[in-house]
């Protein structure tokens, strides 16, 4: 079919293709990235929930995260993660990590080594 001297196919080909916009990543995604790096990328994120938090002077969110470490190497990385988390200096733009605590740890050895870790992180808006 011709439209003003061009076929319909030619008309479709001449349309400008715009690149996809990057999805905006929020503090929760940046926190998961930081936790994954601290876990040496051996952790599987099972659950992540976020609750708004506020005081008279600060606002932010409390994050609850569950991670699994499967296999001997992953469990070793998990043990290091548990030891380092409370004192770790996070660098998340626009956020201050006020608290990072391990709330539970569960080890199993059979049928394969596995470690389940629950953490809570309080992030405050840095504005």
Residue ranges: model-predicted function:
Residues 1-64, 68-127:
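Long, contiguous binding/interaction regions
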């Amino acid at each position: 079919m011709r439209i003003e001297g061009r076929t319909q196919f030619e008309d479709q080909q001449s349309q400008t293709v715009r690149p996809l916009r990057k999805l905006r990543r929020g503090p929760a995604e940046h926190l998961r990235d930081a936790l994954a790096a601290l876990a040496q990328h051996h952790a599987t994120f099972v659950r992540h929930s976020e609750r708004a938090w506020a005081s008279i002077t600060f606002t932010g969110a409390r994050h609850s995260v569950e991670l699994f470490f499967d296999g001997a190497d992953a469990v070793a990385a998990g043990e290091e993660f548990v030891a380092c988390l409370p004192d770790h200096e996070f660098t998340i733009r626009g956020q201050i990590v006020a608290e990072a605590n391990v709330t539970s740890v569960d080890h199993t050895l059979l049928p394969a080594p596995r470690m389940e870790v629950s953490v809570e992180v309080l992030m405050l808006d840095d504005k």
